[in-house]
Regions:
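Transmembrane and membrane-interface helices of multi-pass
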Residues: 1-230
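Soluble catalytic regions of membrane-associated enzymes that act on cell-envelope
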Residues: 190-375
Protein backbone atom coordinates (compact mmCIF):
# COMPACT_ATOMS: atom_id res chain seq x y z
CA UNK A 1 0.00 0.00 0.00
CA UNK A 2 2.76 2.43 0.96
CA UNK A 3 4.79 1.48 -2.11
CA UNK A 4 1.88 2.39 -4.37
CA UNK A 5 1.42 5.72 -2.59
CA UNK A 6 5.14 6.53 -2.92
CA UNK A 7 5.10 5.57 -6.61
CA UNK A 8 2.08 7.82 -7.18
CA UNK A 9 3.84 10.79 -5.56
CA UNK A 10 6.97 10.01 -7.59
CA UNK A 11 5.04 9.68 -10.85
CA UNK A 12 3.28 13.02 -10.37
CA UNK A 13 6.53 14.84 -9.61
CA UNK A 14 8.31 13.24 -12.57
CA UNK A 15 5.54 14.32 -14.94
CA UNK A 16 5.68 17.84 -13.53
CA UNK A 17 9.45 17.92 -14.02
CA UNK A 18 9.02 16.99 -17.68
CA UNK A 19 6.35 19.69 -18.04
CA UNK A 20 8.71 22.19 -16.41
CA UNK A 21 11.45 21.28 -18.92
CA UNK A 22 9.14 21.56 -21.94
CA UNK A 23 7.61 24.82 -20.74
CA UNK A 24 10.63 26.79 -19.54
CA UNK A 25 13.65 25.61 -21.52
CA UNK A 26 14.90 28.42 -23.74
CA UNK A 27 14.93 27.49 -27.45
CA UNK A 28 17.90 29.83 -27.88
CA UNK A 29 19.97 28.05 -25.21
CA UNK A 30 18.80 24.43 -25.01
CA UNK A 31 20.21 22.22 -22.32
CA UNK A 32 22.83 19.76 -23.67
CA UNK A 33 21.74 16.14 -23.92
CA UNK A 34 24.17 14.89 -21.27
CA UNK A 35 23.13 17.60 -18.83
CA UNK A 36 19.47 16.87 -19.53
CA UNK A 37 19.75 13.21 -18.58
CA UNK A 38 21.87 14.01 -15.53
CA UNK A 39 19.37 16.65 -14.39
CA UNK A 40 16.47 14.24 -14.85
CA UNK A 41 18.33 11.52 -12.96
CA UNK A 42 19.16 13.80 -10.03
CA UNK A 43 15.64 15.20 -10.09
CA UNK A 44 14.25 11.68 -9.84
CA UNK A 45 16.32 11.09 -6.70
CA UNK A 46 15.19 14.37 -5.15
CA UNK A 47 11.59 13.48 -5.99
CA UNK A 48 12.08 10.07 -4.40
CA UNK A 49 13.26 11.72 -1.19
CA UNK A 50 10.10 13.83 -1.07
CA UNK A 51 7.89 10.86 -1.98
CA UNK A 52 9.40 8.69 0.75
CA UNK A 53 9.00 11.48 3.27
CA UNK A 54 5.33 11.83 2.34
CA UNK A 55 4.84 8.06 2.45
CA UNK A 56 6.31 7.51 5.91
CA UNK A 57 3.05 8.47 7.76
CA UNK A 58 1.18 5.79 5.78
CA UNK A 59 3.93 3.31 6.59
CA UNK A 60 3.70 4.10 10.30
CA UNK A 61 -0.07 3.55 10.28
CA UNK A 62 0.66 -0.10 9.57
CA UNK A 63 1.73 -0.48 13.19
CA UNK A 64 -1.74 0.52 14.45
CA UNK A 65 -4.22 -2.25 13.64
CA UNK A 66 -7.45 -0.20 14.19
CA UNK A 67 -6.37 2.29 11.51
CA UNK A 68 -4.32 -0.05 9.32
CA UNK A 69 -4.72 1.00 5.64
CA UNK A 70 -5.41 -2.62 4.60
CA UNK A 71 -7.01 -4.35 7.58
CA UNK A 72 -9.32 -1.49 8.63
CA UNK A 73 -11.99 0.38 6.70
CA UNK A 74 -11.33 3.40 8.90
CA UNK A 75 -7.65 3.13 8.04
CA UNK A 76 -8.44 2.97 4.32
CA UNK A 77 -10.55 6.12 4.50
CA UNK A 78 -7.95 7.87 6.62
CA UNK A 79 -5.10 7.03 4.23
CA UNK A 80 -7.22 8.00 1.24
CA UNK A 81 -7.97 11.37 2.84
CA UNK A 82 -4.28 11.82 3.70
CA UNK A 83 -3.30 11.05 0.11
CA UNK A 84 -5.81 13.61 -1.13
CA UNK A 85 -4.41 16.30 1.15
CA UNK A 86 -0.85 15.42 0.10
CA UNK A 87 -1.75 15.55 -3.60
CA UNK A 88 -3.49 18.90 -3.14
CA UNK A 89 -0.49 20.31 -1.30
CA UNK A 90 2.01 18.80 -3.75
CA UNK A 91 0.26 20.13 -6.84
CA UNK A 92 -0.30 23.52 -5.20
CA UNK A 93 3.41 23.86 -4.42
CA UNK A 94 4.30 23.01 -8.01
CA UNK A 95 1.72 25.46 -9.33
CA UNK A 96 3.26 28.21 -7.20
CA UNK A 97 6.71 27.06 -8.29
CA UNK A 98 5.79 27.32 -11.97
CA UNK A 99 4.36 30.79 -11.44
CA UNK A 100 7.41 31.84 -9.44
CA UNK A 101 9.75 30.67 -12.19
CA UNK A 102 7.69 32.34 -14.91
CA UNK A 103 7.90 35.59 -12.94
CA UNK A 104 11.51 35.53 -11.67
CA UNK A 105 13.20 32.63 -13.52
CA UNK A 106 13.98 31.04 -10.15
CA UNK A 107 12.60 27.90 -8.57
CA UNK A 108 10.43 28.42 -5.52
CA UNK A 109 12.57 29.37 -2.54
CA UNK A 110 12.13 30.88 0.89
CA UNK A 111 12.54 34.45 -0.35
CA UNK A 112 9.03 34.11 -1.81
CA UNK A 113 7.74 34.54 1.74
CA UNK A 114 8.36 38.26 1.33
CA UNK A 115 5.30 38.42 -0.91
CA UNK A 116 3.19 37.62 2.16
CA UNK A 117 4.26 40.85 3.84
CA UNK A 118 1.68 42.73 1.76
CA UNK A 119 -0.79 40.02 0.93
CA UNK A 120 -3.31 42.31 -0.75
CA UNK A 121 -0.84 43.64 -3.34
CA UNK A 122 0.56 40.17 -3.99
CA UNK A 123 -2.90 38.64 -4.37
CA UNK A 124 -3.94 41.41 -6.77
CA UNK A 125 -0.82 40.84 -8.87
CA UNK A 126 -1.47 37.10 -9.00
CA UNK A 127 -5.12 37.65 -9.95
CA UNK A 128 -4.20 40.08 -12.73
CA UNK A 129 -1.26 38.05 -14.07
CA UNK A 130 -2.19 34.38 -13.84
CA UNK A 131 -5.34 32.41 -14.84
CA UNK A 132 -6.37 31.78 -11.24
CA UNK A 133 -9.84 30.34 -11.91
CA UNK A 134 -8.73 28.11 -14.78
CA UNK A 135 -5.70 27.01 -12.80
CA UNK A 136 -7.83 26.18 -9.76
CA UNK A 137 -10.18 24.06 -11.86
CA UNK A 138 -7.22 22.23 -13.42
CA UNK A 139 -5.74 21.72 -9.95
CA UNK A 140 -8.95 20.15 -8.63
CA UNK A 141 -9.22 17.91 -11.69
CA UNK A 142 -5.62 16.75 -11.28
CA UNK A 143 -6.17 15.93 -7.62
CA UNK A 144 -9.38 14.06 -8.47
CA UNK A 145 -7.66 12.12 -11.26
CA UNK A 146 -4.74 11.24 -8.98
CA UNK A 147 -7.10 9.95 -6.30
CA UNK A 148 -9.00 7.86 -8.84
CA UNK A 149 -5.70 6.33 -9.95
CA UNK A 150 -4.68 5.72 -6.35
CA UNK A 151 -7.99 4.04 -5.53
CA UNK A 152 -7.69 1.90 -8.66
CA UNK A 153 -4.19 0.60 -7.83
CA UNK A 154 -4.92 0.04 -4.13
CA UNK A 155 -8.53 -1.15 -4.31
CA UNK A 156 -7.66 -4.79 -4.97
CA UNK A 157 -5.18 -5.06 -2.07
CA UNK A 158 -6.60 -7.61 0.35
CA UNK A 159 -5.24 -8.76 3.72
CA UNK A 160 -3.41 -12.08 3.60
CA UNK A 161 -4.06 -14.14 6.75
CA UNK A 162 -0.92 -15.45 8.38
CA UNK A 163 1.47 -13.37 6.29
CA UNK A 164 4.66 -12.64 8.22
CA UNK A 165 3.15 -14.22 11.32
CA UNK A 166 6.44 -15.39 12.81
CA UNK A 167 8.58 -12.96 14.75
CA UNK A 168 11.67 -13.39 12.60
CA UNK A 169 9.64 -12.71 9.44
CA UNK A 170 8.28 -9.49 10.90
CA UNK A 171 11.75 -8.51 12.07
CA UNK A 172 13.22 -9.14 8.62
CA UNK A 173 10.49 -7.09 6.92
CA UNK A 174 10.99 -4.18 9.33
CA UNK A 175 14.78 -4.19 8.92
CA UNK A 176 14.65 -4.43 5.12
CA UNK A 177 12.01 -1.69 4.91
CA UNK A 178 14.01 0.55 7.23
CA UNK A 179 17.20 0.29 5.18
CA UNK A 180 15.40 0.68 1.84
CA UNK A 181 13.72 3.88 3.04
CA UNK A 182 16.96 5.11 4.62
CA UNK A 183 18.89 4.52 1.39
CA UNK A 184 16.24 6.33 -0.63
CA UNK A 185 16.39 9.31 1.71
CA UNK A 186 20.22 9.27 1.74
CA UNK A 187 20.22 9.49 -2.03
CA UNK A 188 23.54 8.04 -3.16
CA UNK A 189 26.34 5.59 -2.46
CA UNK A 190 28.93 7.86 -0.89
CA UNK A 191 30.14 9.14 2.45
CA UNK A 192 27.94 12.22 2.07
CA UNK A 193 24.20 12.16 1.28
CA UNK A 194 22.51 13.73 -1.73
CA UNK A 195 22.48 17.48 -1.15
CA UNK A 196 21.03 20.52 -2.88
CA UNK A 197 24.46 21.40 -4.28
CA UNK A 198 24.52 18.20 -6.36
CA UNK A 199 21.82 19.72 -8.58
CA UNK A 200 24.24 22.41 -9.74
CA UNK A 201 26.60 20.05 -11.52
CA UNK A 202 26.82 22.02 -14.77
CA UNK A 203 27.66 25.56 -15.84
CA UNK A 204 24.46 25.56 -17.90
CA UNK A 205 22.06 27.63 -15.80
CA UNK A 206 18.89 25.71 -16.66
CA UNK A 207 20.30 22.29 -15.75
CA UNK A 208 20.44 23.19 -12.07
CA UNK A 209 16.93 24.64 -12.20
CA UNK A 210 15.62 21.49 -13.86
CA UNK A 211 17.25 19.13 -11.37
CA UNK A 212 16.01 20.99 -8.30
CA UNK A 213 12.95 19.86 -6.38
CA UNK A 214 10.96 22.95 -5.30
CA UNK A 215 9.87 21.45 -1.98
CA UNK A 216 13.39 20.53 -0.90
CA UNK A 217 14.83 23.74 -2.32
CA UNK A 218 12.32 25.83 -0.38
CA UNK A 219 13.32 24.25 2.94
CA UNK A 220 17.03 24.37 2.08
CA UNK A 221 16.78 28.14 1.59
CA UNK A 222 14.77 28.91 4.72
CA UNK A 223 17.85 29.85 6.72
CA UNK A 224 18.80 32.45 4.10
CA UNK A 225 15.39 34.02 3.51
CA UNK A 226 16.14 37.23 5.45
CA UNK A 227 19.56 37.84 3.93
CA UNK A 228 19.59 39.91 0.75
CA UNK A 229 21.46 42.76 -0.87
CA UNK A 230 20.43 46.38 -0.47
CA UNK A 231 20.47 47.98 -3.94
CA UNK A 232 19.78 51.61 -2.79
CA UNK A 233 22.64 51.42 -0.27
CA UNK A 234 24.94 49.81 -2.84
CA UNK A 235 24.11 52.54 -5.37
CA UNK A 236 24.78 55.27 -2.80
CA UNK A 237 28.21 53.78 -2.05
CA UNK A 238 29.00 53.00 -5.68
CA UNK A 239 31.10 56.11 -6.52
CA UNK A 240 33.40 55.46 -3.57
CA UNK A 241 33.73 51.74 -4.30
CA UNK A 242 34.23 52.27 -8.05
CA UNK A 243 37.08 54.71 -7.36
CA UNK A 244 38.62 52.40 -4.77
CA UNK A 245 38.46 49.36 -7.07
CA UNK A 246 39.62 51.24 -10.16
CA UNK A 247 36.53 50.58 -12.26
CA UNK A 248 37.33 52.00 -15.70
CA UNK A 249 33.74 52.36 -16.92
CA UNK A 250 31.63 53.24 -13.87
CA UNK A 251 27.89 52.82 -14.27
CA UNK A 252 25.86 53.56 -11.11
CA UNK A 253 22.65 52.32 -12.74
CA UNK A 254 23.95 48.85 -13.64
CA UNK A 255 26.35 48.81 -10.66
CA UNK A 256 29.20 47.69 -12.92
CA UNK A 257 32.36 46.75 -11.00
CA UNK A 258 34.24 45.26 -13.97
CA UNK A 259 37.87 46.28 -14.55
CA UNK A 260 39.19 45.65 -18.06
CA UNK A 261 42.84 45.02 -18.84
CA UNK A 262 44.71 44.60 -22.12
CA UNK A 263 47.80 42.41 -22.14
CA UNK A 264 50.36 42.27 -24.94
CA UNK A 265 51.08 38.57 -25.22
CA UNK A 266 54.33 37.54 -26.90
CA UNK A 267 53.73 35.87 -30.30
CA UNK A 268 54.01 32.11 -30.06
CA UNK A 269 54.08 32.14 -26.27
CA UNK A 270 52.36 29.13 -24.73
CA UNK A 271 50.06 29.39 -21.76
CA UNK A 272 51.86 28.39 -18.55
CA UNK A 273 50.59 25.80 -16.13
CA UNK A 274 48.97 27.35 -13.08
CA UNK A 275 49.17 25.32 -9.89
CA UNK A 276 47.33 26.46 -6.78
CA UNK A 277 47.98 24.74 -3.45
CA UNK A 278 45.79 25.82 -0.55
CA UNK A 279 47.16 25.13 2.93
CA UNK A 280 44.41 24.51 5.43
CA UNK A 281 44.95 25.46 9.07
CA UNK A 282 48.07 27.47 8.16
CA UNK A 283 49.02 29.96 10.87
CA UNK A 284 50.15 32.72 8.53
CA UNK A 285 50.77 35.18 11.35
CA UNK A 286 53.63 32.95 12.55
CA UNK A 287 55.34 32.91 9.15
CA UNK A 288 57.88 35.22 7.63
CA UNK A 289 55.19 36.38 5.22
CA UNK A 290 53.60 38.28 8.09
CA UNK A 291 56.88 39.73 9.35
CA UNK A 292 58.05 37.07 11.81
CA UNK A 293 61.80 37.85 12.29
CA UNK A 294 62.64 34.33 13.53
CA UNK A 295 62.87 32.91 9.98
CA UNK A 296 60.30 30.24 10.91
CA UNK A 297 59.25 29.49 7.32
CA UNK A 298 62.31 29.94 5.07
CA UNK A 299 61.04 27.82 2.17
CA UNK A 300 57.66 29.54 2.09
CA UNK A 301 59.37 32.92 2.30
CA UNK A 302 61.52 31.97 -0.69
CA UNK A 303 58.44 31.00 -2.72
CA UNK A 304 56.97 34.40 -1.97
CA UNK A 305 60.13 36.40 -2.70
CA UNK A 306 60.99 34.55 -5.94
CA UNK A 307 57.41 34.14 -7.13
CA UNK A 308 54.21 36.17 -6.95
CA UNK A 309 53.06 37.07 -3.46
CA UNK A 310 49.58 38.61 -3.29
CA UNK A 311 49.90 40.34 0.04
CA UNK A 312 46.51 42.06 -0.21
CA UNK A 313 44.57 38.80 -0.17
CA UNK A 314 42.55 38.95 3.02
CA UNK A 315 39.64 37.01 4.46
CA UNK A 316 37.51 38.85 6.97
CA UNK A 317 36.84 35.83 9.18
CA UNK A 318 38.47 32.53 10.03
CA UNK A 319 37.43 29.22 8.52
CA UNK A 320 38.36 27.11 5.53
CA UNK A 321 35.05 27.62 3.72
CA UNK A 322 35.32 31.41 3.90
CA UNK A 323 38.93 31.34 2.67
CA UNK A 324 38.08 29.10 -0.29
CA UNK A 325 35.10 31.28 -1.19
CA UNK A 326 37.18 34.46 -1.13
CA UNK A 327 39.95 32.86 -3.17
CA UNK A 328 37.58 31.49 -5.82
CA UNK A 329 35.40 34.59 -6.23
CA UNK A 330 37.50 37.49 -4.98
CA UNK A 331 34.54 38.49 -2.79
CA UNK A 332 34.79 38.55 1.03
CA UNK A 333 32.50 36.04 2.70
CA UNK A 334 30.31 38.09 5.04
CA UNK A 335 27.52 35.53 5.34
CA UNK A 336 25.95 35.78 8.80
CA UNK A 337 24.37 32.32 8.74
CA UNK A 338 27.06 29.66 8.27
CA UNK A 339 29.06 30.48 5.11
CA UNK A 340 28.43 31.72 1.57
CA UNK A 341 29.49 28.36 0.18
CA UNK A 342 26.38 26.86 1.79
CA UNK A 343 23.85 29.41 0.57
CA UNK A 344 21.76 27.90 -2.27
CA UNK A 345 20.59 31.36 -3.36
CA UNK A 346 24.01 32.60 -4.50
CA UNK A 347 25.43 29.71 -6.50
CA UNK A 348 25.64 31.81 -9.67
CA UNK A 349 29.04 33.45 -9.19
CA UNK A 350 31.89 34.33 -11.51
CA UNK A 351 35.06 32.62 -10.31
CA UNK A 352 38.70 33.32 -11.04
CA UNK A 353 39.00 29.83 -12.48
CA UNK A 354 36.49 30.79 -15.20
CA UNK A 355 38.99 33.29 -16.57
CA UNK A 356 41.37 30.50 -17.58
CA UNK A 357 39.36 29.67 -20.68
CA UNK A 358 42.14 27.91 -22.60
CA UNK A 359 43.24 25.77 -19.67
CA UNK A 360 42.10 22.28 -18.79
CA UNK A 361 41.13 22.21 -15.13
CA UNK A 362 41.95 19.49 -12.62
CA UNK A 363 40.87 19.53 -9.00
CA UNK A 364 42.47 17.44 -6.28
CA UNK A 365 40.44 17.76 -3.10
CA UNK A 366 41.45 16.14 0.14
CA UNK A 367 37.83 15.50 1.06
CA UNK A 368 34.39 15.42 -0.49
CA UNK A 369 34.10 16.30 -4.17
CA UNK A 370 30.60 17.57 -3.37
CA UNK A 371 31.63 20.20 -0.84
CA UNK A 372 28.86 22.79 -0.59
CA UNK A 373 28.58 24.84 -3.80
CA UNK A 374 32.32 25.29 -4.38
CA UNK A 375 32.05 22.25 -6.66
Amino acid sequence: YTIKAVLLFLLVQTILRIVFWLRFESPFDPIPGGDLWQAMYLGLKYDLQVSLGLGIPILLLGWIIPIHPVYSETGKRLCFAYTGVVMLGLLSVYAIDFGHYAYLEQRLNATALRFLENLQISATMVWQTYPVITGSVILVLLVYTSLLLFRFVTGYIQPIPGQYSRWYQKTAVVIITFFVVLFGLYGKLSWYPLRWSDAFFSTHAFSGQLATNPILYFFNTLKNKDETFDIPTARASYPLMAEFLGVDRPDPEKLDYVRRFQYNADPGRTEPNVIVIILESFASYKSGLSGNPLNSTPHLDRLASEGHFYKNFYVTQTGTARSIWTFMTGIPDIELNKTSSRNPLIVDQHTIVNAFESHEKFYFLGGSASWANIR
